[in-house]
Amino acid sequence: MKIKEVIEALERFAPLPLQESWDNAGLQVGLTEAEVSGALLCLDVTERIVDEAAQKGCNLIVSHHPLIFRKLSRLTGEDYVQRCMMKALAQGIVILSLHTNMDNAKGGVNYKIAEKMGLTDVRFMSAKEMNGVEYGSGVVGCFAEPLAADDFIILLKRVFGVECVQANELLRRPIRTVAICGGSGSFLLDDAANAGIDAFVTGEMHYHEYFGREQQIQIAVIGHYQSEQFTSEIFREIIENSCEGVKCFIADTCTNPIMYF
């Protein structure tokens, strides 16, 4: 199977037109006519990721975050983006990113988070349609049984493997309905609060968004990387279901640049 056929399978699931206007999802580096030798699946592309792909015999890297966000005027290796590109090109490695198109796709990033949390009746917060394809930013789901706020925080720590959750004052009412936005979700908080949803889970939140939300909605911020860590599982499921015989590996390299001490 050619690399371009694997890309086509991934982009059937998360079509590029679903990405936000500011995004740069899609093919980042390389030529796609070669036979695919393997795919390395990751959240971010770093030099260590390119090295891992080469070590595992993969000539395709599928990332969530695009390697290239800003316009390039030269290719000299002066920053990590350029070094990753040069290293990948030298080794014949193609880089593909599925970013906000995967966030906005049905069954995408936010659906996977909801699945990990055990939510049911999962749906887009505000569904849209493009060429017969339903999509949207953020999802809403519910627990089969309501949780006390402190138990909700414990659940998040367990599911996402975090030692702490950034939150506002704990709700005194049970939590049943939950809105989710992987990555940075400040832009959806008002929609969730106005809809009467009990809790909002995201990876990042602007400081001033916390004010005035006491006992209105439970804000729970788990970290950008942590909120999207399961995205590679979606990539793997698509490839295994649509690209028979293609080897794929979830990267061993942790690319989270944020550390806590």
Region spans (language model):
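Hydrophobic structural segments
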Residues: 1-261
